[in-house]
């Protein structure tokens, strides 16, 4: 999704009065128009660089995520301004080693992980016990957010319901205290007028308000 399309979709979402925030993927610092759109209403950012993290203008680090695939110097430069997003065991170990020196005694680094509902990545709905054990072995990390990718060729409404159940299961099985979750790949089809998806997300947003109490993003 290009930036202009995202701005239009984000504006449309805000008009729906639904407790879901749009999330933008950024590789570099945004221009003034895009930054203004990010600050106009609650929104989140998934960044690929420290420049994008700092330049987006969002002050709440819980709404800004930086891919752990970024070079270590980028990860260090962005520390304290975002949450890191890991999707492999190697990235988990890298973050554990990298964040330790930044932390006061007794504190943990809050991170996000990407979990694939039907395979396609290292962390999946089928191997929750394995990646939960891995994360519990880390000295410095605590999972506080989840990213769930969607299959654009499938039934998005059904996937959304399943993804919400997956988020609840991971929170229970790890266990962890979730502050946020993001359903990836829904903003564009939603803004194109998928009414069934809109009704499903309204229902899930309502359930979130009474069960998970987490920030709900879509990208």
Where are these regions (language model features)?
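Electropositive phosphate-/nucleotide-binding environments in soluble metabolic enzymes
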Residues: 3, 7, 47, 72, ...
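Distinct, well-ordered alpha-helical segments
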Residues: 33-38, 54-57, 75-76, 92-101, ...
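Non-cysteine beta-strand/loop elements that form the S-adenosyl-L-methionine
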Residues: 45-50, 66-70, 108-117, 141-148, ...
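Active-site-proximal loop/turn and secondary-structure-junction residues that shape catalytic pockets
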Residues: 26-32, 49-51, 69-71, 88-90, ...
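Conserved anion-binding
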Residues: 80-81, 87-145
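Glycine-rich loops and low-complexity Gly/Arg-rich segments
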Residues: 49, 70-71, 88-91, 111, ...
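A charged N-terminal "starter" segment
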Residues: 1-83, 96-100, 107, 177
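Active-site loop/helix belt of alpha/beta enzymes
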Residues: 10, 117-218
């Amino acid at each position: 999704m290009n930036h202009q399309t995202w701005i239009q979709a984000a504006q449309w979402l805000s008009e729906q009065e639904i407790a879901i925030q749009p999330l933008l993927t950024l590789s570099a610092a945004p221009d003034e128009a895009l930054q203004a759109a990010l600050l106009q209403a609650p929104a989140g950012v998934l960044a690929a660089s420290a420049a994008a993290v700092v330049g987006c203008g969002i002050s709440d680090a819980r709404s800004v995520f930086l891919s752990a695939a970024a070079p270590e110097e980028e990860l260090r430069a962005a520390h304290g301004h975002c949450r890191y997003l890991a999707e492999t065991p190697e990235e988990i170990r890298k973050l554990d080693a990298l964040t330790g020196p930044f932390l006061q005694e007794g504190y943990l680094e809050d991170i996000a992980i990407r979990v694939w509902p039907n395979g396609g990545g290292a962390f999946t709905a089928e191997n929750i016990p394995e990646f939960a054990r891995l994360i519990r072995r880390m000295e410095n990390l605590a999972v506080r957010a989840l990213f769930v990718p969607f299959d654009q060729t499938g039934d998005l409404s059904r996937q959304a319901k399943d993804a919400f159940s997956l988020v609840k299961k991971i929170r229970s099985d790890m266990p962890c205290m979730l502050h946020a979750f993001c359903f990836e790949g829904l903003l564009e089809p939603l803004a194109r007028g998928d009414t069934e998806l809109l009704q499903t997300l309204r229902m899930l947003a309502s359930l979130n308000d009474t069960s998970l109490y987490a920030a709900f993003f879509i990208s």
